[in-house]
Curated annotation (Swiss-Prot):
GO terms for molecular function: carbohydrate derivative binding; glutamine-fructose-6-phosphate transaminase (isomerizing) activity. Residues 289-436, 470-611 form the SIS domain. Keywords: Aminotransferase, Chloroplast, Glutamine amidotransferase, Plastid, Repeat, Transferase. The active site is at 2 (nucleophile), 616 (for fru-6p isomerization activity). Pfam families: GATase_6 (PF13522), SIS (PF01380). This is Glutamine--fructose-6-phosphate aminotransferase [isomerizing]. It is an enzyme of class 2 (transferase). Homodimer. One of its GO terms (biological process) is carbohydrate metabolic process. Its EC number is 2.6.1.16. One of its GO terms (cellular component) is cytosol.
């Protein structure tokens, strides 16, 4: 739950580190720092708060030429210890021999810290990361090891999913990089090597990337990468190129990345449709999927956060179009509450970042428990992610690339709708192979899908100003419930999550019929009830649930494309969405709810791109 950057090259590392930290800031952070080697000394600069404070501190204390050609940087999201300067990375050992940045969690740090403390080590911070430099220094001193040996010895004692980058005072031309189930990417340029937890930090400087493997120690210098694994050094040539167009972004004329990304959706979904639909009336394999369609008898979807809500919509779509059971599980729950092992099951792992810690663990467990089973229990693994170079794509046999471009805003917007559309396209592809829909029916669905970007564009042009006005009227609301049925339940849960994330208003989402089974006890004057409704989802009972809340003082807001006088008689406010098919309407409804949440947060003066206490990429379990 942090960002890592490292650089060793011919010029000063200052700009690479600072610019890299800036680009990593979208992942969420509460403090930042850098360490660099100059004149046989490791210098560390850290600060709490925004990276601008760190820049000021660096500029106040060092001229650019005073910052050497090797350094590491870090944006921290507090998991162990409060968000303070003393807890910020990088961390040093007592003698200043080693500086370390770390991402992830060291599970046995308490035991190691106690052991080192008993043996005379004094710790300054409350973090798990500070154990690493002290342990390396201890091993080097007491076991009389060389630097590389001491680092390897220390790393062998650390338990958990983490990555770490280390510089050593007495090896001022090398950076040590190590990962275990928390990814690091190396960048190769002209006369330099770099490392980061996300390629976005490296793209201004290189197009060539190298993925480190788990439990490998990489040593990078100006011109060379060496990998130490199983007792020997190798010099690998494995490389990949990231899609730079997907990684480069700016706010353009928008006030925030989040608002820009809401507006990006018409283009994102159009691109996803074009890349998936091969011709006018067929579904393209596009080289992405080669599933054994007819063998699939069950689905299980694993996801977290907004991806989980997209999975709930996906469940309804898949069951509706393919008529096969679909089970949806939280990634965080899957590993501790394993569901029954079902035969002929396609497991779909959904993750925006492709680096979610709970998701990666869940996939490993699913693969492991099916490994030695009868062939009917063979693991069919498919991922849906926005980063086709991420860890999740390496752990699944097949992957669907959302092609949404990088999403800077912490709250998911375009990736949520792209995930939902991906489920729809996947369902049609499976329906075509399993003959659960006639060709004519599939073509009708495809025609509706092709109209979706136009419907979203229409909504953004016609309705944004009215949604903005409505948000201003309702900004003092302190409690909110979202309700919907079927396809709209996932949209309701996602709408509630969006409002909660960026406006900090307490809200929850429920199945419309469930509000009377407990939640209505919380309804009082000025409680806002947002109802997502359409004629095909038991409109009358949804209206009845809304009216029951209104009788207890609630303010009612409807998201709908229904043209009916009963809507105006029942609801206090209405957000109209374009008339479109039921499945596509669940996506356009989500865009309306994103705009509503955005402007509620806007009128509260919140930092919408970086809401409090949230991180974009949750790499810890």
């Amino acid at each position: 739950m942090c960002g890592i950057i490292g650089y060793v090259g011919e010029g000063s590392c200052r700009d690479v580190l600072i610019n890299g930290l800036d680009k990593l800031s979208y992942r969420g952070y509460d403090s930042a720092g850098i360490a660099f080697i100059k004149n046989s000394k490791i210098n560390v600069v850290r600060s709490k708060g925004r990276i601008e404070k760190l820049k000021e501190k660096i500029n106040d204390n060092f001229q650019k030429f005073e910052i050497g050609n090797i350094g590491i940087g870090h944006t921290r999201w507090a998991t162990h210890g409060e968000p303070t300067e003393i807890n910020a990375h990088p961390h040093l050992d007592a003698e200043g021999q080693f500086a370390v940045v770390q991402n992830g969690v060291i599970e046995n740090y308490v035991q190691l810290k106690n052991y080192l403390t008993v043996n005379g080590t004094y710790f300054l911070s409350d973090t798990d990361a500070e154990v690493i430099p002290h342990l390396i220094a201890y091993k080097q001193k007491h076991l009389k090891l060389q630097i590389v040996e001491a680092i390897l010895c220390a790393l062998s004692e650390l338990k958990g999913n983490f990555s770490t980058v280390i510089i050593a005072r007495d090896m001022p031309d090398s950076i040590f990089v190590y990962q275990n189930k928390t990814a690091l990417t190396l960048g190769k340029g002209s006369n330099f090597y770099s490392v980061s937890s996300d390629p976005i930090a490296l793209i201004p400087y290189t197009k060539n990337f190298i993925q480190l493997h788990d439990r490998e120690l990489g040593i990078i210098s100006i011109s060379q990468l060496a990998i130490y694994n199983k007792g020997k050094f190798t010099y690998p040539s494995r490389r990949f190129k990231a899609n730079l167009n997907d990684l480069i972004t700016n706010k353009a004329s928008f006030d925030s990345y989040t608002l820009k990304e809401i507006h990006d959706q018409k283009k994102v979904l159009r691109n996803l449709i074009i890349s998936t639909l091969q011709s006018e009336k067929s579904i393209d394999e596009s080289g992405q999927l080669h599933l054994e369609y007819k063998k699939i008898k069950n689905f299980q979807i694993i996801a977290c956060g907004s991806s989980f809500n997209a999975a709930l919509v996906g469940k309804v779509i898949l069951e509706k179009l393919i008529r096969i059971p679909v089970h949806v599980y939280y990634g965080s729950e899957f590993k501790t509450n394993l569901p029954p092992l079902l035969p002929c099951t396609l497991t779909i792992a959904v993750s925006q970042s492709g680096e979610t810690g709970d998701m990666l663990s869940a996939i490993e467990i699913e693969k492991s428990r099916r490994k030695f089973q009868n062939t009917v229990y063979k693991p069919y693994l498919l991922s849906i992610t926005n980063k086709n170079y991420s860890s999740i794509t390496k752990k699944t046999a097949q992957s669907i690339d959302l092609k949404a471009g990088i999403e800077i805003g912490v709250a998911a917007t375009k990736t949520f709708t792209a995930q939902t559309l991906s489920f729809y396209l996947l369902a049609l592809k499976l329906a075509e192979h399993k003959f659960t829909l006639r060709k004519k029916e599939i073509n009708k669905h495809l025609d509706e899908i092709r109209n979706l970007p136009k419907a979203i564009a229409h909504l953004l042009i016609k309705d944004e100003s009215s949604i903005k006005w409505l948000s201003k009227q309702l900004k003092e609301i302190s409690k909110c419930f979202y309700i919907g049925k079927g396809l709209n339940l996932g949209s309701a849960l996602e709408g509630a999550l969006k409002l909660k994330e960026i406006s900090y208003i307490h809200c929850d989402g429920y199945a419309a019929g469930e509000i009377k089974h407990g939640p209505i006890a919380l309804v009082e004057n000025n409680t806002l009830i947002i109802t997502i409704t359409d004629p095909e989802q038991s409109q009358e009972s949804t209206f009845a649930s809304s009216q029951e809340a209104k009788a207890r003082g609630a303010v009612l807001l409807a998201i709908t494309h229904i043209e009916d006088s009963s809507i105006y008689q029942t609801f206090d406010f209405i957000i109209k969405i374009p008339k479109i098919s039921q499945i596509c309407a669940s996506i356009t409804s989500s865009v309306s709810l994103q705009l509503f949440a955005y402007y509620m947060a806007y009128y509260k003066g919140n930092d919408i791109d970086k809401p409090r206490n949230l991180a974009k990429s949750v790499t810890v379990e």
